[in-house]
């Protein structure tokens, strides 16, 4: 499609003009049939945005052997494997620009449930029940169970920085905001900005990622595009 758009004005208008054109509708019908029957993509305003989200979804080739990506293309299912922590990265990482995505658990959290970012070098599986995301210098994570921020195997304080921060509720969508210009990672809950969690991120390609420990739990990640200011 991209190559056609370069040589044909009609295709260019279809791809870069109307984001709900028949081209994008057709791609959604063909690639996202399962997801379109649910509310997974309800916060995406156009068919083009839905297709883009699928391009940025979890990678079936870059996750622990103990998880699989469901037919909807956006949800990770962790198999009930004892003494293992399992993660997944998305298909596409970011080295520039500003990006936002939503993550939510659709099952129990267990003792550790971490959302954040990772380089391509960060491991996506380890023994035991640990905070895999944030366990080394290649990943940064927020543990939704105890509200700790994790990087390089250390706790970098609690988050959000307020008294009696509410615990995560299953099904609650958390918005993650990665700013590769300012080198920061921030979070929102229910459109409430919770603050910047990490600063001084490296000039590297960083991927949205999660890690989970509870058997048969499921995690969904949906890429939203450029975050809205304000």
UniProtKB/Swiss-Prot annotation:
Keywords: Cell membrane, Cell projection, Developmental protein, Membrane, Neurogenesis, Nucleus, Postsynaptic cell membrane, Secreted, Synapse, Ubl conjugation pathway
A GO molecular-function descriptor: ubiquitin-like ligase-substrate adaptor activity
InterPro entries noted in UniProt: B30.2/SPRY, B30.2/SPRY_sf, ConA-like_dom_sf, FBXO45-Fsn/SPSB_families, SPRY_dom, SPRY_FBXO45
Pathway listed: Protein modification; protein ubiquitination
Cellular compartment(s): Secreted; Postsynaptic cell membrane; Presynaptic cell membrane; Nucleus
Main location: secreted
GO cellular component labels: cell projection; extracellular region; glutamatergic synapse; nucleus; postsynaptic cytosol; postsynaptic density; postsynaptic membrane; presynapse
PROSITE patterns: B302_SPRY
Pfam families linked: SPRY
SMART domains the UniProt entry points to: SPRY
Domain B30.2/SPRY, first and last residues per copy: 36-228
Sequence intervals crossing the membrane: none
CDD domains found in the cross-reference section: SPRY_Fbox
Keyword Iron appears in the UniProt entry: no
The keyword Cell membrane is assigned to this record: yes
A biological process term (GO) from this entry: protein K48-linked ubiquitination
Protein task: Component of E3 ubiquitin ligase complex consisting of FBXO45, MYCBP2 and SKP1. Functions in substrate recognition but plays also an important role in assembly of the complex. Required for normal neuromuscular synaptogenesis, axon pathfinding and neuronal migration. Regulates neuron migration during brain development through interaction with N-cadherin/CDH2 after secretion via a non-classical mechanism. Plays a role in the regulation of neurotransmission at mature neurons. May control synaptic activity by controlling UNC13A via ubiquitin dependent pathway.
Complex and partners: Forms a complex with MYCBP2 and SKP1. Interacts with HEY1; leading to FBXO45 nuclear translocation. Interacts (via SPRY domain) with CDH2.
Protein family membership: Belongs to the FBXO45/Fsn family.
Protein name (Swiss-Prot/TrEMBL): F-box/SPRY domain-containing protein 1
Organism: Rattus norvegicus
């Amino acid at each position: 499609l991209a190559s056609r758009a370069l040589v044909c004005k009609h295709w260019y208008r279809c791809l870069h003009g109307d984001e709900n054109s028949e081209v994008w509708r057709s791609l959604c019908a063909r690639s996202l049939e399962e997801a379109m029957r649910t509310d997974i993509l309800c916060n995406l305003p156009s068919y083009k945005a839905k297709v883009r989200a699928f391009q940025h979804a979890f990678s079936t080739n870059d996750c622990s052997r103990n998880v699989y990506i469901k037919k909807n293309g956006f949800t990770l299912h962790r198999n009930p494997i004892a003494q293992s922590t399992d993660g997944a990265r998305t298909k596409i990482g970011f080295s520039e620009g500003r990006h936002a995505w939503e993550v939510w658990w659709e099952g129990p959290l267990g003792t550790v449930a971490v959302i954040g970012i990772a380089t391509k070098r960060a491991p996506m599986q380890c023994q035991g029940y640990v905070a895999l995301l944030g366990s080394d210098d290649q990943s940064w994570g927020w543990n939704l169970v105890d509200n700790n921020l994790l990087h390089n195997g250390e706790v970098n304080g609690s988050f959000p920085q307020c008294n009696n921060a509410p615990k995560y509720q299953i099904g609650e969508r958390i918005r993650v905001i990665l700013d590769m210009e300012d080198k920061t990672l921030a979070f929102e809950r229910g459109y409430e900005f919770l603050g910047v969690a990490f600063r001084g991120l490296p000039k590297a390609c960083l991927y949205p990622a999660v890690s989970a420990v509870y058997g048969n739990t499921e995690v969904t990640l949906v890429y939203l595009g450029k975050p809205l200011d304000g």
